[in-house]
Amino acid sequence: MNNFAKRIIPCLDVNNGRVVKGVNFVNLIDAGDPVEVAKIYNDSGADELCFLDITASFENRDTIVEVVRNVASELFIPLTVGGGIRKIDDISRLLEAGCDKVSINSAAIKNPNFIDEAAKKFGSQCIVVAIDAKKTDQGYHVFINGGRVDTKIDVFSWSKEVENRGCGEILLTSMDRDGTKSGFDNYLTGKVSKSLGIPVIASGGAGCMEHIRDTFLAGADAALAASIFHFGEIKIDDLKRYLRTQNIEVRL
């Protein structure tokens, strides 16, 4: 299989070591158990898995390391973990526990040198920069703190900067589309993707198979979604067969 196959990535929110926002699979014994959920996705054709650690309290940060350790032993597809990663030590611990990539967001904005340091120490292939984009009167801006704070930084110049600093991939979320199921922001995805030499993961807005096809046609290298997969609205193997009929290269 060539390296240009498009990737499908389910995303799970993990809070204090438990999957939240419900996962609705018929054959799932415990929908809150990350290991159970990861195994199902591993076996159902997902290309990668993404965990977003939304644990609020710092004292519980150790839980995500344990989760990664437990999940990694059962998982044969790459695992990316994001949420609250602020220090080189955070990355070391997660990679040692068995995760393949880490996703950094607010910390990259607050200290852009963190990207350079992380890429230099662990290699670009491990470092994903998550960009939460929202349309404003002044154009697309980068938002942080869960989409609450407008940094006033232009998304297109920031994505170029993080590439230059050594990140290996961008996770680009449209805050406007997130949760709407009305389709990805393909203008945003396409413009970022065409300006960069690194892969772009599109996120925010997936509601049907056509939406995922359209974001790939716009230039996304991977599509990330949550509820449409978790609630069984779209089965990944069905999605991949559909994409094949649309002449989009995927791994079956």
Curated annotation (Swiss-Prot):
EC number of the protein: 4.3.2.10
Pfam families per UniProt: His_biosynth
GO MF assignments: imidazoleglycerol-phosphate synthase activity; lyase activity
GO cellular component, one term: cytoplasm
Keywords: Amino-acid biosynthesis, Cytoplasm, Histidine biosynthesis, Lyase
Family: Belongs to the HisA/HisF family.
UniProt cross-references to HAMAP family, sorted A to Z: HisF
Name of this protein: Imidazole glycerol phosphate synthase subunit HisF
Organism: Campylobacter hominis (strain ATCC BAA-381 / DSM 21671 / CCUG 45161 / LMG 19568 / NCTC 13146 / CH001A)
